[in-house]
């Protein structure tokens, strides 16, 4: 997390998604079911790349709505920031990303979890970002928790079916 221009990172993110789309085409067990003729492969491949690029852009948008302090709270190991919200907030603030323990506790409560500290990996971080976006579209007291858990479920099902189809 740093401040700076979106260029070239937006294009790197889109290219990553496009490459993943290509990998989905060549390794997926569902691709042969979509192909009636060899000439259809190019369109299916490009469609996969475009959809993967869209997913990459959505991930970038979800990451950009997160406060950097929350991002570091979620992605830093417990050994570095502590399991205590007050100590974690102090460590993250000392890193240069001001945040207070009340914000960490409030965010955890909003998403229906006991804590958001040390939730390493992209899935929880993306889920919190998507929950922020979606709860703005459909407001409500419990909607943040709903969208957070929906995003986690969607990610898990998407990944599991992609792995299943690709193996």
Model-derived features: positions:
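Helix-loop-helix junctions that connect adjacent transmembrane segments
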Residues: 1-20
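Helix-boundary and loop/linker segments of multi-pass membrane transporters
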Residues: 2-4, 137-142
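Helix-loop junctions at the membrane interface of multi-pass solute transporters
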Residues: 14-40, 44-49, 60-65
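Membrane-helix boundary/coupling elements in multi-pass transport proteins
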Residues: 16-35, 95-126, 145-167
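Extracellular/periplasmic helix-exit of transmembrane alpha-helices
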Residues: 50-129
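Membrane-interface interhelical connector segments
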Residues: 131-136
């Amino acid at each position: 997390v740093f401040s700076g221009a979106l260029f070239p990172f937006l294009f790197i993110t889109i290219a990553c998604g496009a490459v993943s789309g290509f990998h989905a085409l060549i390794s997926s067990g569902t691709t042969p079911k979509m192909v009636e003729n060899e000439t259809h492969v190019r369109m299916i491949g490009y469609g996969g790349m475009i959809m993967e690029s869209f997913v990459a852009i959505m991930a970038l948008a979800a990451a950009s709505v997160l406060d950097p302090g929350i991002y570091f709270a979620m992605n830093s190991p417990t050994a570095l920031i502590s399991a205590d919200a007050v100590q974690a907030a102090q460590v993250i603030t000392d890193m240069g990303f001001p945040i207070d323990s009340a914000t960490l506790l409030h965010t955890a409560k909003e998403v229906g979890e006991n804590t958001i500290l040390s939730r390493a990996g992209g899935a929880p971080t993306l889920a919190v970002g998507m929950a922020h976006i979606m709860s703005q579209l459909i407001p409500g007291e419990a909607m943040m928790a709903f969208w957070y858990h929906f995003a986690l479920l969607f990610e898990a099902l998407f990944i599991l079916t992609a792995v299943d189809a690709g193996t």
